[in-house]
Amino acid sequence: MSSQLADPTYQGDLGNGLIRRWSTAADQPKIGQCLATVFRPNADAPLNVRSIDEVRILMSGAHPFMGPGDFAIVEDTNLPERPVVACTCCWSHTWSYAGIPFGVGQPELVATLPEYRNRGLVRALFEMAHARSAAKGEMMQVITGIPYFYRQFGYEYAIDLEGHRTVAAADAPARKEDEPEPYSLRLATVADIPHLQALYNQERDKSLLWHELDDGYWRAHITSWDDPAIQGKDVTQIGMIGPLRMIVDKDGAVCGYIWLATKRWGSALRVFALQLYPHVNWQQAMPSLLRACRAHGEQTPGIRAESKPFSEISFGLGRSHPAYTVLGEKLAPRGEPPYAWYVRVADVPGFVRHIAPVLEDRLAASIATGHTGELAIDLYRGGLRLQFEQGKLAAAEPWRQPDYGDDPPAGCPPLVFLQLLLGYRSLAELRATFPDVYAEPEAALLLDILFPKQMSMMAWMSYT
């Protein structure tokens, strides 16, 4: 048994008969029971069987983001069945910043049984998750989650997440009777992986941050629907949200892909991804795709008996998308702005050093090309010192305000700085919002060059 938080054999005593440890395959039923109990509408509702199936998928050994030993759990040893009373799982990804790859850890499925809440169990589990992520060399942790909660663990909202435009299903344009449908959908196969990679990565250069997906991800996404464990089951009871579909023309040539849900959480059919090759005309394709989505939605069941009837198509494609432009205000008058990813970067100087080539390229392309000088940024609980020599980053290191002397030329709350670092907000936007963000003119010029506002398109990519 190890005392190291990241070690698979670690076990820690939390008092009152509670221990924290890493999962094994044998824990799957108890983890599923915990999540199925927590993720339901109310205490009297049936267990959420989709959560049980999701745990089966995640712990199968075939999931691209994690394995059976990647749940951090708390179990109650006072009870004979030693139930799992709190848990989170730890996914691992490769993202990139302007093309520079780095590791990312993602805690997900964070849950505590109601009777065990307010005991610090999630904090204890996040200590384990952060330790394991650090042991893997991951420079960043991210999470999608409920408002505010994860700020207490060092996370800040710093990347767009989703964003929706909604079309009334009845408004899908009718096809002329004498014209064949120009585009149709078919299920993706492993033979489509080169197309999926090419279509997905079309947007890579437009996004500051990017989720680097290998062929194994697409293969798992596709073949998971062939699993004997789900054959013949009600789709509302399984943990996966929907298979990938290829968009093909009248001749069967691949023109794009779309990711549609196989169940509804309300009246809307959700569209998680949509991409077309550059040679395909979006204006010509969208009417056909709307009709295909409407037909699919009419066959898509709600997850509850009381679910509202299908009436809408919700395109969750981010802040902007070619489909939104084509739909316009007439077809998609109602939208929802993006939520955001929570982001944690424990070693900001280390991350800055990692992306130094990008910063140097930005300097070289600016009016400050060949810059030599120091920039100290007060982060209030510490700071960051950047030293440039002839346009090259010579140092990025922790800095602390001395007891006496002038204030540094720039200051920013420590977590808010992540919004600047990751291009989520400009310096001017942060200064207009936070009174404790400041920069003297020369420092402001340099910060604007080094950390410009830039869009990141980071979609939810798990198929569960």
List where the protein language model places each region.
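Intrinsically disordered, low-complexity, positively biased terminal segments
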Residues: 1-29, 33-46, 53-56, 75, ...
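Conserved catalytic-core segments centered on acid/base and nucleophilic motifs
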Residues: 133, 141, 150, 245, ...
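Conserved acetyl-CoA-binding loop-helix of GNAT-fold acetyltransferases
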Residues: 109-112, 118-131, 281-295
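Flexible glycine-/small-residue-enriched beta->alpha junction loops
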Residues: 157-181
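Conserved active-site alpha-helix within GNAT-family acetyltransferase domains
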Residues: 135-139, 144-164, 316-337
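N-terminal, Lys/Arg-enriched amphipathic/low-complexity engagement segments
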Residues: 43, 54-72, 87-89, 99, ...
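Conserved beta-strand in the GNAT
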Residues: 71-73, 81-93, 104-106, 111, ...
